A protein has these predicted regions:
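Short regulatory helix/loop adjacent to the ATP-binding pocket of P-loop NTPases
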Residues: 168-175
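P-loop NTPase nucleotide-binding core
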Residues: 2-129, 136-143, 157-158, 164
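Conserved catalytic/switch belt of AAA+ P-loop NTPases
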Residues: 145-157
Length: 175
């Protein structure tokens, strides 16, 4: 099982690790991935799709604050800021490399997958995104996020690893 997961990590496709409770799903993930290779989002049963997307952005390094502008649905947009390290060679008399920190400010609609993809691309984010306990999300949120996964796959190089308790092999595909 370990080798099969490692092989699939190199395929640029989303991965689901599923099964019944207490079967070693999280242990498998921890065993096969280095901590620096992923961000971990622990799902909650109280989250909406926007909450899930906000948590992904926060774990990716964004600071989120509510904006005064609204989406076409009348919901408040979010102002997102991320620190970008720019390494410059040469620099001062010491001859070493210098690092400049710049902040990128974006205005996002957390329910728009295109905004989320754009923000992660803007931050030059390349880690795996692990969604642990995906089954805790409401069915509607699971369905909506399964649809977003298609956009993430087609419009970015981002790879999600979804860990959850269910027995249906096609759980996310049927959406």
């Amino acid at each position: 099982v370990d080798e099969r997961l490692r092989c699939n990590l190199n395929r640029d496709k989303h991965i689901t690790i599923f099964g019944s409770s207490k079967q070693g799903k999280t242990c498998l993930r921890k065993h096969c991935l280095n901590k620096n290779d992923y961000i971990l989002v622990q799902c909650s049963n109280r989250w909406s799709l926007s909450d899930l997307n906000a948590n992904i952005l926060k774990r990716a390094g964004y600071e989120l604050t509510e904006s005064t502008n609204v989406t076409y649905e009348g919901k408040a947009k979010v102002s997102a800021s991320v620190k970008i390290l720019d390494a410059t060679l040469g620099g001062e008399a010491g001859g070493g490399a210098t690092k400049n920190v710049t902040h990128r400010q974006l205005e996002l609609d957390l329910s728009d997958v295109n905004d989320i993809i754009g923000a992660l691309n803007e931050a030059d984010f390349h880690q795996y995104i692990v969604l642990e306990d995906f089954h805790y999300l409401k069915s509607e949120v699971q369905k909506d996020f399964a649809i977003e996964l298609k956009a993430f796959h087609e419009s970015s190089k981002l790879c999600f690893i979804i860990v959850g308790v269910w027995l249906d092999e096609n759980k996310l595909v049927i959406y």
